[in-house]
């Protein structure tokens, strides 16, 4: 790196290997403050308040090297033209286009698929639904759901990530867990309804530029230890189904409020 004549290093990751790089580099190394101590206090229940968002933490790194950046004039990518996709011949674009990404990496962050199917059945009466997923097993489950409803389409099989992003850019609303699809939709300026289980937006990981009202949370009085972890990978056994205390009716009501 020194041979390349680099003036400074910006580290937006803040992990062990970049800390090692910081030690070797020794100068003009600007690193993200991930707020680990604050987050630790949050999950231990020492306090319960909104922490700085991850987006703001990224921005702060650039401000430290005198880049005058802010979120006041946010520009999002334009919607992608979907005419090249054969599936669009079956989609009624006169209806609102709602994306649903019903899966997450950890089970304690994943809403019951049976309950989500109730949501789908209700809102598909008036709107078009696109289903997003990744793994092979997810794709099979979503295909079965879509085959039983003419207003529900699965993009989990036969569509690359790039393809899925094209469709995400055209959504009127994305419904997701605390997972990647919600963040991807937010990057296109799409409204995102996030369903939270054992994690919480106070940790700073809510999708970018979203109204706080676009979150459905588990009852904190019933599950006072939430957030049990930052990423949803740790939770008491009795909390693993906490997300399913949210009713389909709550989700349907919130969808109607947003769109």
Segments from the language model and where they lie:
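Catalytic machinery of carbohydrate-active enzymes
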Residues: 1-259
């Amino acid at each position: 790196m020194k041979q390349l004549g680099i003036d400074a290093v910006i580290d937006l990751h803040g992990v062990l290997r970049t800390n090692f790089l910081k030690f070797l580099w020794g100068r003009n190394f600007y690193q993200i403050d991930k707020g680990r101590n604050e987050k630790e206090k949050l999950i231990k229940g020492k306090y319960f308040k909104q922490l700085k968002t991850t987006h703001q933490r990224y921005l702060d790194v650039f401000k430290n090297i005198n880049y005058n950046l802010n979120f006041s004039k946010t520009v999002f990518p334009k919607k992608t033209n979907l005419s090249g996709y054969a599936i669009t011949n079956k989609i009624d674009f006169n209806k609102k286009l709602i994306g649903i990404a019903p899966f997450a990496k950890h089970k304690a962050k994943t809403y019951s698929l049976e309950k989500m199917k109730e949501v789908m059945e209700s809102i598909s009466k008036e709107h078009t639904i696109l289903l997003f997923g990744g793994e092979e097993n997810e794709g099979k489950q979503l295909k079965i759901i879509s085959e039983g409803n003419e207003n529900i389409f699965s993009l989990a099989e036969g569509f690359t990530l790039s393809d899925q992003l094209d469709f995400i850019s055209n959504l009127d609303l994305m419904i997701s867990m605390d997972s990647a699809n919600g963040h991807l939709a937010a990057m296109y300026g799409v409204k995102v309804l996030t369903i939270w289980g054992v994690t919480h937006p106070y940790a700073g990981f809510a999708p970018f530029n979203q109204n706080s009202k676009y979150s459905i949370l588990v009852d904190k009085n019933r599950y006072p230890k939430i957030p049990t972890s930052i990423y949803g990978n740790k939770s008491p056994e009795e909390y693993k189904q906490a997300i399913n205390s949210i009713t389909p009716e709550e989700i349907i009501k919130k969808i109607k409020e947003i769109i």
